[in-house]
Amino acid sequence: MSTTTPQTVTRAETAAPGPTRPVLAVDLVTDPALVGRFAALARRLEEAGAGALTLSDGGLHPIHVAAHLAPVTRAVGLLPRTDAVYVEPFHLATQLMSLDHISHGRAGWLLHAQTDPSVPATVGRSPLDRAATAREAADVLETSRLIWDSWAPDAVVRDTAGGKYLDASRLQYADVEAETFSVRGPAITPRSPQGLLPVLVADADRAAAGERVASELADGRVLDLDLRSGTDGALEAVAAAREEADGPVVRLVRVVGLDLGADPLGPVPELIDALREQGLIAPAPVVGTSLREQLGLPPAPYHPDPVRRADRARLTREDHS
């Protein structure tokens, strides 16, 4: 990615060496037929001890469903699985920031690189090959982090007497010229509670997202447990993944394949209890815990860069006056 700025925000700067234990997540497919049940289902899963919910596209946009669930849940993380390729990067980053705001710091991004050949035409583009798809995913992820980092935590001053809402010197541009898109920042949304949202890649999405995204840029790996073939071997799979010395750290264990039209919880409560009894997953989250904290990630630092300051034009004029 080529940018007009010398500084980028990478996973290496924001990720801890390793988590304590991975968070247990349950995947919900956003089927429009289930729209009236999502809130109740999310609350039941939270009560059962799930640490997070992932939202996979089943017809309704995953970010929209996550936004619907944010006010009706209290502690679970919310990670929409959404495309990083055939999107408007600025809008995507802003939507995820907004989700972090309304969930009070419980939002994350399960990065997906779209490979369905019918999708590009819906946004007026031609399909990308595998290598270009991986490059685009990396560019969009890096750009999103620049946008998320474009407001300092103290940028909003709300000086009523002085008629000043924000301090422009505490904003910075996210100017990007990538291979297929360009972006001008800063964000139109103040810095969200987590600053930099956690970005994870599921094993099933690793090939399409590319090795650079999965191994270098993302904050960790998602291990999938498909319950359509039963729960046999689930504990062993989680234990084995935690012992792997090479590759990205497993930060999320995701239960997939639930029949949401029947008994949606099925064996999930028992599986959660068994995994916790063996010390294989993190404890259930408490209210007020950010998703970064749950995943074992440190607080995301702000990266001030004088070259990117939003008031740089005014400063330049003053320097030459």
Where are these regions (language model features)?
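Short, acidic/polar
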Residues: 32-45, 92-95, 203-213, 230-246
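Hydrophobic faces of well-ordered beta-strands that scaffold small-molecule active sites
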Residues: 20-28, 51-55, 76-82, 105-113, ...
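Flexible, glycine-rich active-site loops centered on histidine and acidic residues
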Residues: 20-22, 26-32, 89-170, 247-254, ...
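Extended, intrinsically disordered, low-complexity segments
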Residues: 130-141, 146, 278-321
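Alpha-helix-loop-beta-strand connector modules within alpha/beta enzyme cores
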Residues: 60-79, 139, 269-283
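Conserved, mostly hydrophobic/aromatic
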Residues: 45, 49, 69, 99, ...
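Acidic (Asp/Glu)-rich catalytic clusters
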Residues: 43-47, 66-75, 96-106, 212-217, ...
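N-terminal beta1-alpha1-beta2 module of alpha/beta enzyme domains
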Residues: 2-73, 196-197, 220, 286-289, ...
